[in-house]
Amino acid sequence: MVIKAQSPAGFAEEYIIESIWNNCFPPGTILPAERELSELIGVTRTTLREVLQRLARDGWLTIQHGKPTKVNNFWETSGLNILETLARLDHESVPQLIDNLLSVRTNISTIFIRTALRQHPDKAQEVLATAHEVADHADAFADLDYNIFRGLAFASGNPIYGLILNGMKGLYTRIGRHYFANPEARSLALGFYHKLSSLCEQGAHDQVYETVRRYGHDSGEIWHRMQKNLPGDLAIQGR
């Protein structure tokens, strides 16, 4: 186990998460007692207690007053906020994780983009107009793309879609910085935003579904060609 955390709390958090991931602390089992675990990791009990509370909030553990701390099956109890952690833990599975993430984005965005353009066209156009001034480099496009999808999610009138995008932000923007280094990807995205703006202006809401699906397919083709050069820094760094 190689841990690169920059603080005692970060070290303890990574130690416990990696132990859960590697089945040293299997789902359904009881975590060692606080004193034993703090000595094992090499941190104070106060630090450990703070870390355990944070991991419980993220779904890794269940803490109940007067009972031992239980290890959860994180696939069943955690949220989107652990995406980057999963990417760090299992780099070999990152391509599949990203494919799943992008598939979810396409599937839900066919719904909220159509709703945004139909029910709140002025808000949708305001979001899409931000593409007019974007600088032609990867970082700018990564932020723009995330903010356009997120903005349209909230413009749909259903904030739950926006919260889902919030949960994807970390890994989503890291992927974007790699993906949008490709000029073809930037050009495709600009064409997509322009097409959505035109559909909104024309009131052609019935064409949104196919437009979004086509963009998901075409951007996926570019992404798959780029995966062989996937960088190793898509996961978060140690705390």
From Swiss-Prot:
Pfam families: FadR_C (PF07840), GntR (PF00392). The keyword Transcription regulation applies. It is found in: Cytoplasm. PROSITE patterns: HTH_GNTR. One of its GO terms (cellular component) is cytoplasm. It comes from the Bacteria. HAMAP family: HTH_FadR (MF_00696). This is Fatty acid metabolism regulator protein. It comes from Salmonella typhi.
